[in-house]
Amino acid sequence: MRVDDFDYELPPELIAQEPLDRRDATRLMTVDRLKGEVGEVSFREITRLFRPGDLLVVNDTRVIPARFFGVKESGGRVEVFLERRLAAVGERWQCLLRSSKPSRPGTRIVLAEGVSAEVIGRSDGDTWCVSFTPVTGFDEWLERNGAMPLPPYIRRSAADADRERYQTVFSRQRGAVAAPTAGLHFTPELLDELRERGVEIATLTLHVGLGTFMPIRVERVEEHRMHRERYIIPSATADAVNARKGGKGRVIALGTTTCRTLEHAARDDGRVAAGAGETGIFIYPGYHFKTVDALITNFHLPKSTLLMLVSAFAGKELLFRAYHEAVTRRFRFFSYGDAMFVH
């Protein structure tokens, strides 16, 4: 299977650069896999697509303000992009470093408010292991001095408003460097309305990493290796998912991160195990879904692993017809754009 088979033409002006004033003012494309039909409603109407007994599983990860700048002791500005915390004790992180001259082990970086960093050595791929001091209060320092890590296709600097709008209303667990964007459309009122309709809402955590922005660098889909991301599935969530396997209702995944986590933890009978770990699951056409019955997701980049996942779930022909419709109807694409309900 060729990566180029997942390409499509997207006018640049359809890439959303700002969120709408209201989270639920976005548009929702509906994709019926059984009937092969594509429709459209307002996102605030999504509750009528649920049935009593359904389970909505959401990713409660919270995006950290992971981007900031410093100056090397030897001179020269450096941009630091935190990817993940490496040590349970101390502030040792896997980071991207950007500067005019390459970094090397032993490089020291002077940061705001008396904080400093030292490059320890290479980590995975293009990343570095970096140690920060002092370690006390580093999360608070980051909140004051870091910027939200907006995706590269948003052609502007992060603003104060992004600290709220690039988070879901149910974000709790700090650790992501990209938002689970399908969740950005939900308001507390919509979640309450779902509960009133007899829908159960459960949480899991998958800390979205830098790999979500990384292009595929091979020609064949099967040769690609996914980045690994940390996840937690609470016992209550596993129990709620497993109850649906007895016919109580559908398991509806809010976003590809939730979908990947559930499928990673699923057995052949669709039941999932509670626990914590890392997943590098890569889902593309030909994959047999074990536990997810419906998927809410945003529109994804051409030739991306996320587009391949949704192609596997919806069927590639139907999905690309839906994307063609979305372009024709001038839907807004990517993180701050519109959404899709595939069922």
UniProtKB/Swiss-Prot annotation:
GO MF terms, alphabetically ordered: S-adenosylmethionine:tRNA ribosyltransferase-isomerase activity
GO cellular component: cytoplasm
EC number(s) reported in the record: 2.4.99.17
Listed Pfam families: Queuosine_synth
Top-rank taxon: Bacteria
Top-rank EC class of the record's enzyme: transferase
Keyword vocabulary terms for this entry: Cytoplasm, Queuosine biosynthesis, S-adenosyl-L-methionine, Transferase
Annotated GO biological process: queuosine biosynthetic process; tRNA wobble guanine modification
Pathway annotation: tRNA modification; tRNA-queuosine biosynthesis
Keyword Membrane attributed: no
Catalytic activity annotation: 7-aminomethyl-7-carbaguanosine(34) in tRNA + S-adenosyl-L-methionine = epoxyqueuosine(34) in tRNA + adenine + L-methionine + 2 H(+)
Chief subcellular location: cytoplasm
Transferase in keyword set: yes
Subcellular location: Cytoplasm
NCBIfam families reported for this sequence: PRK00147.1, queA
Record's function text: Transfers and isomerizes the ribose moiety from AdoMet to the 7-aminomethyl group of 7-deazaguanine (preQ1-tRNA) to give epoxyqueuosine (oQ-tRNA).
UniProt similarity note: Belongs to the QueA family.
Oligomeric and partner information: Monomer.
HAMAP family: QueA
Protein known as: S-adenosylmethionine:tRNA ribosyltransferase-isomerase
Annotated source species: Geobacter metallireducens (strain ATCC 53774 / DSM 7210 / GS-15)
